[in-house]
Design a protein with these regions (language model features):
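S-adenosyl-L-methionine-dependent nucleic acid methyltransferase catalytic domains
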Residues: 1-150, 156, 160, 172-174, ...
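Short hydrophobic/aromatic beta-strand or adjacent loop that forms the aromatic wall/cage
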Residues: 161-165
């Protein structure tokens, strides 16, 4: 099926909402805008899972180090090769917790009963994320690990080679869901040729989205490079992403078009 600019997934938005800039195709869409504004425009019970890699507002133990650009905090690329920075990553911890709880509360309203939520985070913000999740009314169910396999060695210290997936559900989560047993540790190196500063490996996300029941609709409120949306579509789901950055909206839309058009042509 050819890609279009008016995917059916956008029918779950409030009909009175002025449609933001968007791009999409068969079973996917990316909306350009602020998640705090757009999340409130979806109809209740619209999504079977919320899976996202939000801004961590981390990268240091002091406000001075946290206030650096995302490239300075999370990338070792030279200035000539640096990727675009992204917003909402310079908050102090209390502000970040309130902001995170706010969008998670909006996300819970539009998630179906029992829908899983998966949130990537680093070790510094791990405790705060578990609190924000519960403040927003979700049931916290555990933490999975992304083992990045390698990281910069530090003499006399443990390697910081892991990030975490805080996960939970919108209330009770029936054991009879049509989902298999998923691992608690995912081992994948950082992707090469990234288009986003904190891009996650595609195969990692293809594994993680399988927490959703087959054929469900997945929301990523912080789409970034579009990896979650791409992984979801490749695994047979519908997916909606939201991205505030002009640069990353364009990059993710182009990536999805290219990847999914290629798959359509091959089939």
């Amino acid at each position: 099926m050819p890609l279009t600019n008016t995917p059916e997934t956008l029918n779950i938005l409030n009909p009175d909402f002025r449609m933001p800039e968007h791009c999409g195709g068969d079973r996917w869409s990316i909306l350009h805008g602020d998640s705090l504004q757009i999340l409130r425009q979806f109809e209740p019970n619209s999504f079977d899972a919320i899976i996202t890699d939000p801004p961590y507002a981390s990268g240091g133990s002091s406000q001075t180090t946290k206030s650096r650009s995302t490239n300075e905090k999370y990338s070792s690329m030279s200035k000539e090769k640096a990727l675009p920075d992204f917003d909402s990553d310079q908050m102090d911890q209390l502000s970040w917790m309130f902001w995170t709880a706010a969008w998670l509360q909006d996300a819970r309203r539009i998630a179906k009963p029992g829908a899983p939520v998966c949130l990537f985070i680093d070790w510094r913000q791990l405790p705060a994320m578990t609190l924000a999740l519960q403040w927003a009314g979700w049931t916290w169910r555990g933490v999975a690990v992304w083992d990045k396999v390698a990281s910069r060695p530090q003499k006399g210290r443990f390697r910081q080679q892991s990030e975490y997936i805080v996960w939970g559900s919108n209330g009770k989560m029936p054991l009879e869901r049509n989902v298999g047993c998923l691992p608690g540790v995912f081992r994948y190196p950082n992707p090469q040729n990234r288009i986003h500063v904190t891009e996650k490996p595609l195969q990692l996300m293809r594994d993680v989205v399988q927490i959703c029941e087959p054929g469900g609709r997945i929301l990523d409120p912080f789409a970034g490079a579009g990896t979650t949306v791409l992984a979801a579509v490749q695994e047979g789901y519908e997916a909606v992403g939201i991205e505030m950055s002009d640069a990353y909206f364009q990059r993710s839309a182009e990536r999805l078009k290219t990847a999914l058009e290629s798959e359509v042509n091959q089939n």
